[in-house]
Amino acid sequence: MRILVFLFSMISLNGICQFSNYWIEKNDFTGGKRERSVAFSIENLGYICSGVNTSEVSLNDLWVYNPNTDSWEQKANLPGSVRRNAIGFSINGIGYVGMGMDSVIASESIPLNDFWAYNPLDNSWEQKANYPGNGGTGIYFSTAFTADGKGYVCGGKFGANSYSNELWEYKPSIDQWSQRTNFPGGVRYQLSSFTIDNKGYVGLGVNQDVYKKDFYVYNPGSNQWSQIQDFPTERGSASSFSIFNRGYICLGTNGGLLGDLIEYNPEINQWTAKCSYSGSERKCAVSFVINNRAYVGTGKGYSGKKDSMHEYFPENTLGVQDISNLSQTLIYPNPTSDIVNVRSYNNDAIQLIDSRGNIIQSIFNPEKLEKIDLSMLPKGIYFIKSIDFEEKIILE
């Protein structure tokens, strides 16, 4: 069955998709298929660094993504060792990457404690104070978040059977680490985290060999943790991000691979299923946010490592004026297998767009009721955009 999805409402066979809650496939990551990388965003650009490629070789390369051109460009390699399962974040226009393991084979690997700052203005790296946690032995499989101009690293592993529940705070202004209150969920690795209102939300992961679903919020001001509503299911190695004061957990593993997206609302302490990831199920993928849109990709799926990237449009991305115009365009039936009806009022053009953003068909000065034939198109998800000639995009 072909599925037509119009831009401001979406129906998918793979998940729950509602108003302004959908995914679009982007160009593949040109750094090659990989997993266990780190990512961060600076200004209007996204960055992916390190990881493990299809030859099972750890990496130290850095790539930058421009959403305006949907393209990638390689930048200066991370100095020091190649690494996997490191941490990354950005603060005040500077990217930070560190820790991890220097080899794919655990028995031949050394946990790393070095920490580096990337300046995009001159494409340069500078070494910063080493991570001092767990006696300075290094850490990998931990999670990181930022709050109030500081970075935080929580949990992880520092040996084959050595796990951490420590929380460390990094202050860029003085290049200094300080230990804070331990994570209350016990020792943990493969955790997930995101930031809302200058508070860190941390949970999930693996307690030695048991997948967990508990979640906690950390208040840097009081240096205290509080437990919040459990995540719906246990998992580790998920991707996470926050947009519009909402937190998101995507993908991961609970033994099998997962492809769902779950949103957390701190106002009501509740998790809600959102539109499932439009790519294949995977774990150890990366995520970053640009202009209130999330980009999630790479990772490892059932068929191996991935280079595909997908963009998520959350709810609340439309303004009041945009929302007031929704009633002027109706699309039905949806799903459809051949013909879709587009009833449009006061619009100068409508466009049919595929999931990669390619314009399939444009209709200028449309009739109030246009019938669009989809019978020759491959099955999938499509979008309708309504436009007027004053350059005002009614839906985006």
Task: Please state what every model-predicted region is.
Residues 1-4, 396:
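Positively charged n-region of N-terminal signal peptides that target proteins for export
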Residues 3-13:
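Sec-dependent N-terminal signal peptides
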Residues 5-7, 139, 334, 370:
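Generic hydrophobic-segment detector
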Residues 9, 17-317:
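Kelch-like beta-propeller repeat domains
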Residues 14, 105, 368-369:
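Generic secondary-structure boundary signal with a strong preference for alpha-helix termini
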Residues 323-396:
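C-terminal outer-membrane/trafficking sorting elements
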